[in-house]
A protein has these predicted regions:
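N-terminal secretory signal peptides that target proteins for export/translocation
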Residues: 1-7
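Bacterial N-terminal signal peptides
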Residues: 10-21
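Short S/T/G/P-rich N-terminal loop/turn motif that feeds into the first structured element of a domain
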Residues: 26-114, 121-231, 236-264
Length: 264
């Protein structure tokens, strides 16, 4: 079993290298505090256009300032182009340079809940804040035009973190590599909630598709790639029991906002 698992992983890693995919594989729990904070927001339908503009004009500028100061290593605001009852209107993803830098965000929260100042709070409200780790992520060398990307966000709950890590390594990552090989997926991030207590997500997948056409091929490509993996014993084992490992909740299609009214 160990030899088989190593061969499967080596094959996946070789394919990822050929694709130019930067990847991270989680083998053990993190040894420091979480450096990722994710915040979701809800806005009344009448306020959504103004809230979108506020995020692009004001919020992104404040986050860029924090990045310039070295507090953030990366940030992103995703906006749901549709009004949906059971998800969110916007989500901010903050990647901090160090765990200690998250204290700066706590200070901001004292006067700007969820990072929103008074003007922002008139347009929307922060709903949930998650402290998370980012054990798995990757991106192709040439992801295409930023403004064309379509983001697909999938929350999961699981019963065992250790089993879930093995599931992602053996079942999810080989498929993700295949989707990248097919040219439809240009990047992915898989977060794990550091404090998964209560009816919140334990793991959050954020996929970036090359464009709307590529996103439309999602089901076709999933089926095609799975056919190439079905003869791998470890992949097949997790495929057969995946429903006992995790539970999926409502997905969100989103665009990444950028200054000036576009998406990225």
């Amino acid at each position: 079993m160990i030899a088989t698992r190593f061969r499967n992983f080596a094959a996946w890693l070789f394919a990822a290298t050929l694709l130019g995919v930067g990847c991270a594989v989680a083998q053990s729990p993190p040894s420091t505090g979480p450096t990722q904070i994710l915040i979701t927001y809800r806005s009344e339908p009448a306020n959504r256009p103004a809230f979108r503009t506020y995020l692009q004009r004001d919020m992104l500028a404040r986050l860029e300032k924090l990045k310039g100061e070295g507090v953030l290593s990366r940030y992103q605001i995703l906006f749901n182009p549709f009004t949906t009852a059971n998800t969110w209107d916007a989500m901010t993803i903050l990647s901090f340079t160090r765990y200690a830098d998250t204290l700066r965000w706590q200070q901001i929260e004292r006067t700007q809940p969820g990072g929103l100042d008074a003007a922002g709070l008139r347009l929307a409200r922060p709903v949930n804040t998650y402290s998370a780790d980012l054990p798995w992520h990757g991106e192709v060398d040439y992801p295409g035009e930023q403004g064309n990307g379509v983001y697909y966000v999938i929350p999961y709950e699981y019963s065992s973190a250790d089993q879930y890590r093995k599931y992602v390594d053996a079942y999810v990552l080989p498929q993700v590599t295949g989707w990248m090989r097919e040219g439809v997926l240009t990047g992915y991030r898989i977060f794990m909630n550091r404090y998964p207590v209560g009816p919140l997500w334990d793991s959050l997948f954020v996929y970036r598709y090359r464009n709307l056409e590529a996103f439309g091929r999602r089901d076709e490509v999933i089926a095609k790639v799975r056919q190439t993996l079905v003869d791998q014993p470890e992949w097949k084992q997790f495929s057969d029991i995946k429903q006992t490992i995790r539970t999926e909740s409502e997905n969100t299609i989103a665009e990444a906002l950028q200054p000036g009214g576009g998406a990225r």
